């Protein structure tokens, strides 16, 4: 497992070196990858697996095609650049409220989860988001209009504060 993290960090370092950028602080990490700020006020996310990179990049490309930088009052980072060999995407840095992290999203096809799984997921998300759950559902519905189906919905990815 540490090998994958080391590889993601090495990919991030190669990405910035290839573009004459510098890494600043780490902004976060999760199952999908690791995110750093750069010296040009952008964020780069080095993904741990190629399918995650492809999903993240392709969702950002769809957002770009439709000129989406805001959904229901939440900022959406714009795609700046990417590297398909290093599995890195570069986006604008946005402040809350925001919607971000699309590595687990589905494009043009709704994920096929069993009803029992979806019922449990709905309960968990309602509890996590509390009074904002209706707003989260509206954000998800708006993205579905563009063929984007969010799967990794959590307060770190959809933030109102």
Feature map (PLM): residue ranges:
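Juxta-kinase regulatory segment immediately upstream of eukaryotic protein kinase catalytic domains
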Residues: 1-25, 58
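Nucleotide/phosphate-binding site architecture used for ATP/NTP-dependent chemistry
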Residues: 10-11, 18, 50-51, 57, ...
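ATP-binding glycine-rich loop module of kinase domains
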Residues: 24-69
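Conserved hydrophobic "DFG−1" position in protein kinase catalytic cores
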Residues: 37-38, 46, 81, 90-93, ...
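Conserved structural core of kinase catalytic domains
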Residues: 71-133
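Conserved hydrophobic core/spine positions of the Hanks-type protein kinase catalytic domain
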Residues: 138-139
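Catalytic-loop of the protein kinase fold
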Residues: 143-155, 160
